[in-house]
């Protein structure tokens, strides 16, 4: 699921490629609260996505995901959480990256403090099952299920 223009580029890029028939797309603007999120999936995956939005927008997106999933669906959220970094320098760099993204992107983007993101997840009707830190260059993977 992505913006219509992004879906168009994806479909153009996979056309005629092996496995293209296994990719199913859905166009929509997740920032519009009335945009329905398709359901029935076993897994929902978001990678470095939620940090682009305000806390209110994150709760809206996650709430709609919670309404669309099955009882046994797992929701995976991969983000760079500044307070869960192995090295202090990495935490500092992520905090400074937030300033850059806020100024240069949409005015909302920031790297989350893990407690803030955990609250957003809970407020959206999801429960954190596990957090795995230090994946790749400082990513955390949060595994969630319905409350």
How would you name each of these model-derived features?
Residues 1-147:
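Alpha-helical subdomain
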């Amino acid at each position: 699921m992505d913006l219509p223009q992004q879906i168009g580029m994806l479909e153009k890029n996979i056309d005629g490629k092996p496995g293209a028939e296994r990719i199913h797309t859905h166009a929509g603007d997740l920032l519009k609260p009335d945009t329905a999120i398709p359901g029935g999936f076993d897994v929902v995956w978001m990678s470095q996505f939620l940090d682009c939005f305000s806390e209110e927008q994150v709760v809206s997106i996650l709430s709609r995901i919670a309404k669309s999933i099955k009882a046994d669906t797992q929701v995976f959220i991969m983000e760079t959480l500044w307070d869960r970094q192995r090295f202090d320098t990495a935490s500092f760099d992520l905090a400074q990256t937030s300033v850059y993204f806020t100024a240069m992107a949409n005015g909302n983007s920031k790297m989350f403090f893990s407690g803030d993101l955990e609250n957003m997840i809970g407020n959206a009707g999801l429960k954190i099952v596990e957090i795995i830190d230090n994946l790749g260059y400082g990513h955390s993977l949060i595994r969630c299920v319905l409350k």
